[in-house]
Amino acid sequence: MTNIIRQFLRQEAAGGLILIIAAAIALLMANSALQGVYQSFLDIPVSIKIASLDISKPLLLWINDGLMAVFFLMIGLEVKRELMEGSLAGRDKAVFPAIAALGGMLAPALIYLLFNGADEVTRQGWAIPAATDIAFALGVMALLGNRVPTGLKVFLLALAIIDDLGVIIIIALFYTQQVSLQSLGIAAAAIALLAYMNWRGVGKTSAYLLVGLVLWVCILKSGVHATLAGVIVGFMIPLHTQDQRSPSESLEHGLHPWVAYLILPLFAFANAGVSLQGVSLSGLTSLLPMGIATGLFIGKPLGIFTFSWLAVKLGIAKLPDAINFKQIFAVSVLCGIGFTMSIFIASLAFEGTDIALTTYSKLGILLGSTTAAVVGYSLLRLVLPARRKAVNVR
């Protein structure tokens, strides 16, 4: 395993533990005497005015639209690297996790629709349980230390990256509001400029980020979700230049600590603070939260394991070396941790609707993700080899 992937896994695992702490603090504040302080923090108005450009949003939306664009920039960089040189490079490497990820997105969505397909409003949340929180999942896996085979970590990483790519496509196709053609036209010009810079071998990361900032503003104004700008910029930054430098790798290396230790925990803190005031048992067991929780805890492992097993049995893909189906099943349960990505989709799906829908969807996400984390960890402990003890040689 390359040093890049090792460092990635270490930072994701540590970041996952910080995520848990941030979410717990948010829940405590939202349900204590500090609720007002918590809400006031999220409502802080932040404005940027440059000439005729005026963007005014509360801090919560700057986190969701702005900082999360940086997260998706890193996702774009990661996906490009893995597709060209990493765990997804070549058909043989990519097929198994790709098929597993497809099953892990289809089954949860279908299960959610079994619960909520008849309701025109809650039906919009069908993609909520389709997401996997890679940082959280790797954080739980890290608790088992060196008992986890490298191949299993890489499988989870590859599966989650493909899952992220699927979520990006879902956001672009299904969670886009009314579109401004003028803003989209300028955005298209910015994308064309980025592509030209890539073709010409421009190696200055700052040039891509400057054009990317223009792209982010245009996409924000267009009605398409602004986080997509981050993915596009990530794909456009060259992996290698003529002088053998890697602008993409350098930027990913620089961004990763900020994303793992600040941006994602801040997103979790801003979005996980669900007030339980007014929450009833009947509401908690209603179709919306139950559809999400069941989709995450049952749908994810059902889809990932079934598609993986069929792919191997039909000869479409090969099981990675030194990994068995018991371990695949345990990891597939762990992939039911949707958390930040699921909360992000829920905020898009129920934007402008009854606040109760957002509240109960978050509770469903927390219920499903927590159950998946506990059961997934327990299963991994059972199926992984015992920790090797050091032997003193005299």
UniProtKB/Swiss-Prot annotation:
Subcellular location: Cell inner membrane
InterPro entries tied to this protein: Na/H_antiporter_dom_sf, NhaA
Keywords: Antiport, Cell inner membrane, Cell membrane, Ion transport, Membrane, Sodium, Sodium transport, Transmembrane, Transmembrane helix, Transport
Name of one Pfam family that matches: Na_H_antiport_1
Keyword Transmembrane recorded: yes
Catalytic activity field: Na(+)(in) + 2 H(+)(out) = Na(+)(out) + 2 H(+)(in)
Example GO BP: regulation of pH
Predominant place of localization: membrane
Coiled coil (residue ranges): none
Transmembrane annotation, as ranges: 14-34, 59-79, 95-115, 125-145, 154-174, 179-199, 213-233, 254-274, 292-312, 328-348, 363-383
Topology class, membrane: Multi-pass membrane protein
Gene Ontology cellular-component terms listed: plasma membrane
Molecular function GO labels: sodium:proton antiporter activity
PANTHER family: NA(+)_H(+) ANTIPORTER NHAA (PTHR30341:SF0), SODIUM ION/PROTON ANTIPORTER NHAA-RELATED (PTHR30341)
Function: Na(+)/H(+) antiporter that extrudes sodium in exchange for external protons.
Family, as annotated: Belongs to the NhaA Na(+)/H(+) (TC 2.A.33) antiporter family.
Protein name (database record): Na(+)/H(+) antiporter NhaA
Origin species: Yersinia pestis
Gene name, Swiss-Prot/TrEMBL: nhaA
